[in-house]
Amino acid sequence: MAPGRVGLAVVLWGLLWLGAGVAGGSETASTGPTITAGAVTNASEAPTSGSPGSAASPEVTPTSTPNPNNVTQNKTTPTEPASPPTTPKPTSTPKSPPTSTPDPKPKNNTTPAKSGRPTKPPGPVWCDRRDPLARYGSRVQIRCRFRNSTRMEFRLQIWRYSMGPSPPIAPAPDLEEVLTNITAPPGGLLVYDSAPNLTDPHVLWAEGAGPGADPPLYSVTGPLPTQRLIIGEVTPATQGMYYLAWGRMDSPHEYGTWVRVRMFRPPSLTLQPHAVMEGQPFKATCTAAAYYPRNPVEFDWFEDDRQVFNPGQIDTQTHEHPDGFTTVSTVTSEAVGGQVPPRTFTCQMTWHRDSVTFSRRNATGLALVLPRPTITMEFGVRHVVCTAGCVPEGVTFAWFLGDDPSPAAKSAVTAQESCDHPGLATVRSTLPISYDYSEYICRLTGYPAGIPVLEHHGSHQPPPRDPTERQVIEAIEWVGIGIGVLAAGVLVVTAIVYVVRTSQSRQRHRR
């Protein structure tokens, strides 16, 4: 019995010892120290946008030197299952320029997770806007960050080239390329030099740039390494290719890069229905004025809500001027004024700024039909009178005599009387009879453009002059002739006396 009891006790003791060992191992695994390579930044503790890092891309900071045999570097161990940290994934340098201050280089060669915040710009320069498109008259700002500019005596020059230089810039500029040891191409105008006292005196400054520019059109602001080029007003003259050259004071062309500034200006739309005379076809003109660039302008015409499809009725022309381009479109109706009611014209203009954006505007106007006036001319004893009935207010007469192309001056007297039609009046003009001309023309002036010339011709023989008046004129003519002869005689006598006295004086001196 004793050996059996002893064996049973040994078995029970072994089972207890084994259970204690298992429990101890579990406690050691759960309570042993956990080695981590970094701390997790919560969203509530994320730095502001002005500081490096963000909640979306936490910065991994080592807290201890891990044992390479027990832990892998840059690997984090979660402490709370509800909010596990994300393991940062290595990212390559982005090709597109960032839009804010780049993050500093992470510690321990750890690359932060890719997020919406920009990273450190590659290359010696980074510009936030390489190809801005701005509205006419607006203000443009281009921000560039120059690497290592605070470690040297930095000098920056900016040159402007027109959009279509002649000869063109060779080779063609690449907006993403950074050039080295390349001087500014010829044909440019200098808009900025951070060291104006070192500028070549033969350099041509752009309008609104350089020392003494009033008002200044260009400015560069901001502390290094970031510089902001500000163009006060974008116009066809200020748009173009801008070449930024920088380097040391003694080597300002160590680096160079291109920035393009483009302008757009939507057209303004006006519709002018033509005033037509009875018997003339209706017309209307639509003008898309002062737009840029010269992208296609499309006109759709409607006459009394019916679209005009016949291309023979529409004439469209484009004109270039310093402020841009203007397109004029004129539609001619098949209907004639006086035979049908006045027509209502609608012009729909579409201008494509680019392949995606366009402007569309409408304008409507009613055509005006004017009655054809009746012009009469009456000759009196001393005056000739010309009358035109029912003409628009503001219309008057101009008189022409014979073949003289200039109007008769200081002789026409104009009066207006009311007419039965609203907005119309009867015009009467009086001109004294001429003793030198027999042909008279009275012409109506002041009609809207497009109205044909309206005039009346008349003939009248010059009346004989008054005998008394003729005698007076002849007497004046004879008096003038007598005065001329007398003056000539006095001059002759004076000359003779002078010659005689001169000869006598010479003879005395000889003696």
UniProtKB/Swiss-Prot annotation:
Record-annotated disulphide pairs: C127-C144, C286-C347, C386-C442, C390-C419
GO biological process, one term: symbiont entry into host cell
Keywords associated with the record: Disulfide bond, Glycoprotein, Host-virus interaction, Immunoglobulin domain, Inhibition of host complement factors by virus, Membrane, Signal, Transmembrane, Transmembrane helix, Viral attachment to host adhesion receptor, Viral attachment to host cell, Viral immunoevasion, Virion, Virus entry into host cell
Quaternary structure, from the entry: Interacts with host complement component C3b; this interaction inhibits host immune response by disregulating complement cascade.
Cytoplasmic side: 498-511
Record's signal peptide: 1-24
SUPFAM superfamilies according to UniProt: Immunoglobulin
Pfam family of the protein (one): Marek_A
Spans through the membrane: 481-497
GO cellular component terms given for this protein: membrane; virion membrane
Sugar-bearing residue positions: N42, N70, N74, N108, N148, N181, N197, N362
Ranges of residues in domain Ig-like: 267-359
Chain intervals for the UniProt region annotation (Heparin-binding domain): 137-151
Membrane-topology descriptor: Single-pass membrane protein
Family: Belongs to the herpesviridae glycoprotein C family.
Name assigned to this protein: Envelope glycoprotein C
Function: Major attachment protein that mediates binding of the virus to cell surface heparan sulfate or chondroitin sulfate. Also plays several roles in host immune evasion by inhibiting the host complement cascade activation, and by providing a shield against neutralizing antibodies that interfere with gB-gD, gB-gH/gL or gD-gH/gL interactions.
